[in-house]
Each structure stands twice: as C-alpha cells, then as structure tokens.
Amino acid sequence: MQRPWAEPYKIKAVEPIRMTTREYREQAIREAGYNTFLLRSEDVYIDLLTDSGTNAMSDRQWGALMMGDEAYAGARSFFRLEEAVREIYGFKYVVPTHQGRGAEHLISRILIKPGDYIPGNMYFTTTRTHQELQGGTFVDVIIDEAHDPQANHPFKGNVDIAKFEALIDRVGADKIPYINVALTVNMAGGQPVSMANLREVRKVCDRHGIRMWSDATRAVENAYFIKEREEGYQDKPVREILKEMMSYFDGCTMSGKKDCLVNIGGFLAMNEEWILQKAREQVVIFEGMPTYGGLAGRDMEAIAQGIYEMVDDDYIAHRIHQVRYLGEQLLEAGIPIVQPIGGHAVFLDARAFLPHIPQDQFPAQALAAALYVDSGVRAMERGIVSAGRNPQTGEHNYPKLELVRLTIPRRVYTDRHMDVVAYSVKHLWKERDTIRGLRMVYEPPTLRFFTARFEPIS
C-alpha cells in the first residue's frame, strides 16, 4: 500500500469563506454580465480565477516584509532581489516592475519595430497586445499537438522548429527581434517545454542572430515536468534544472505573482548591458526608479524570499500533484479536459463539454458562468473571448482551443476544496444540455475578456 503524503506546510492564518444560495449567485452573475472577472470576491466560495497574485505567503516572506528598505533610490531590497535572480535564474541584470505586463511593456518597446514578427509557442493575451501596440505581429510556432486537448504529448509546449525556420525563410531574420518561449504555456493548458527543445531553438537562434527570450512566469513548474518526463533529469533538483533552462535564454519577463509566491511584482532580466540601459531609461517613465520599478521595498524582499522557496523540491511536487488530484477526478468521470494535466490549472474542454453551443456564442464563457451559479466556484474563460479580434480585419480570432481554466492558487486551498470543485463540475456534466450560449452586449477595444459583458441567448 502506498504511503499517503500531505501538504509540505502548516497553516498559521486563515480567511473565512462563505457559501451563498443559488438564487444569490444567479443574481450576482447576472449583475456581473456573466463575466466571472466582474464578480465581487466576497461572493465567491472557491476562487480559481487565477494563480496570479493569489498565493499564500510563508512566514519567512511575511518576516521579509519587515526588512523592506523603502528608500526611493538604491534600496538594499533591490540588491537582495537582484542577488536572488542572479543565483537562481542566472541572468546578469534585473529591472523590477510592478508585475509581469510591466516587463512585457518594456521589452516590447525596446526590441520591437513596426513590421516585425515575434514567433512564440502560442499567444498570451497581454504579451500579444504589447507586441501589437509596438507594430509587431505575433506568429504561433508551437507544435500542432498543443491545439488538440486530447493529444497526450509530454511536452505540448514545444516550439515546432520547422515552423520557426519557415517563418525565418519567409520574412527574414532581420524582421524577427526575438522568439518568445513561454514556460509553461498557459493558453495550451499549462503545458511544458522540454530541455531538448530549448537547445534546438537556441541553435536556430544562434544560426540566424535572433534573440531567445522567455516568459518565465511558471518556469519552475516547467522544470518539475522536465524532472518527471525527460530522460537524464529524474535525479536532478528542480533548482538545477531551472538554472539550465534559463541558460539558453538572453533574458526573460517575469510575473512574480505566480512562481515567486507573492501578491504583486515582477521583473525584466537580461544578459545584454545595452538592453539593461534601455530598460532603465524606460522604467523611469512608466514604472519608477530602476531600483524599485513601481514596487515597495517590502515587496521586493518578499519576491526575493519567494524565489528561494519556489525551487524547494517538496513544495513544487505538492504544487503539481494538487492540480493533478483535481484533474484525475474529472478524467475518472469521463469529463473532457486538456491532457496531460498542466502545471497550474485544470482546463475543461468547453467544445466537447458543450457541443451544442457554437463558438461565436462563447461556450467557455457560458460554462464558467454556469459553474459559478452551481457552486460558487469562480473559473476563467480561455477561448474566443480571450483570443480577441484580428487588429486588421476586426473579426473574431477563432482559437482551436475553447477552454475553462480552473486555476489553483499556491498554498491556499486543501484537497477538500478540490473535491468540492470536482463535484460541481461532475454535476454540470450531467446537466450540460441545459446550459445556453451567450451574446456579447459590451466589448472593450482591447483585452476584452477582463471587462466584456454578456447575456444569455433565449
């Protein structure tokens, strides 16, 4: 018999949550325009909207807050953050930002010119928006398996080398400032990239003089999957695997609100001094001094401490297995989800869950709203609403994946919470024919999934 195992932490403080009535939730989602982003948090029972900034900090991180140096310039907290990034990630230079999209903004302004092409292993909403705002065009070069929810490829986040080289041949290397490799790939279901693939991408970049950049937001989760699935890494600590992964990149954007186990903050890291200088010039305009980048000293201290905690092997094993615990319950019930189960979330396949709802009636949005009404569980749409519109034609982008993301915050919920979520999803699966599509009644010009409003189609 296998010995059971438990969370590698004790709980020191708790926050009460409350279950509401179905009638209350029906009114709440109606007032929110059937957009789970617009719900009030006190009306949510279990919040699986995102793992961004929703983590529980450790006692050492809370203690680190008291060590924050709030000097306007040259704060020692910045140098502690810089030291942590250099030691764990291996990059020479660091510029703090208020969160990940601050770093995306900086690197997009520095490297992208109008008419450039930025290949990547599937789009991410804010990343692509920053690229387009600078006149660039995102090009998806992920392997085909990533677009099939049922394809059980161990590294569905891999770059398709043939697609990457075909783009270079078509537009020329001088039109490609960098390739952006996400670790893991959020929009594909939290899927990892193999170390072998990173090496191959690096070879192509070196051959053509193209920079290799990483969205390292969930790189620790990626490192754990390499440890599990890639030959030669089973006996290596996650900390060592992460360092090797980052060694193939020229720099990274980072949202500390995920891997780093904090509620706010991010950074831009790089090896080229001229990019550092440009980033410092830009960060003063948009974020703050180069030694705080829109963050309080105490937040930089918490990020630095979190960087050391995130590479603890026991912690990251628990993190991945809690997500897997939820996903395996759904698979056993025959519910369609993205496979293999990802690192930060379980993704429901809304196309297969609600085949009677056409994509232009927003099935993932409808399913997320129905889940909230059923149980008070808040999830996130990751389908046509998130994909937005083509900036040239104004038409909807129709992604192959139409997903609902059940995102697990780090060190926040227990497996009993996962049981509640699984029960609700299984109940909806039985009642799926009763769920109706939606029409969009308000649409903002960019990043519409945050604030768009909907109503049911009768």
From Swiss-Prot:
<comment type="similarity">
    <text>Belongs to the beta-eliminating lyase family.</text>
</comment>
<keyword id="KW-0663">Pyridoxal phosphate</keyword>
<dbReference type="InterPro" id="IPR001597">
    <property type="entry name" value="ArAA_b-elim_lyase/Thr_aldolase"/>
</dbReference>
<dbReference type="InterPro" id="IPR013441">
    <property type="entry name" value="Tyr_phenol_ly"/>
</dbReference>
<dbReference type="InterPro" id="IPR015421">
    <property type="entry name" value="PyrdxlP-dep_Trfase_major"/>
</dbReference>
<dbReference type="InterPro" id="IPR018176">
    <property type="entry name" value="Tryptophanase_CS"/>
</dbReference>
<comment type="subunit">
    <text>Homotetramer.</text>
</comment>
<dbReference type="GO" id="GO:0006570">
    <property type="term" value="P:tyrosine metabolic process"/>
</dbReference>
<keyword id="KW-0456">Lyase</keyword>
<feature type="modified residue" description="N6-(pyridoxal phosphate)lysine">
    <location>
        <position position="258"/>
    </location>
</feature>
<dbReference type="InterPro" id="IPR011166">
    <property type="entry name" value="Beta-eliminating_lyase"/>
</dbReference>
<protein>
    <recommendedName>
        <fullName>Tyrosine phenol-lyase</fullName>
        <ecNumber>4.1.99.2</ecNumber>
    </recommendedName>
</protein>
<dbReference type="GO" id="GO:0050371">
    <property type="term" value="F:tyrosine phenol-lyase activity"/>
</dbReference>
<dbReference type="InterPro" id="IPR015422">
    <property type="entry name" value="PyrdxlP-dep_Trfase_small"/>
</dbReference>
<dbReference type="InterPro" id="IPR015424">
    <property type="entry name" value="PyrdxlP-dep_Trfase"/>
</dbReference>
<dbReference type="Pfam" id="PF01212">
    <property type="entry name" value="Beta_elim_lyase"/>
</dbReference>
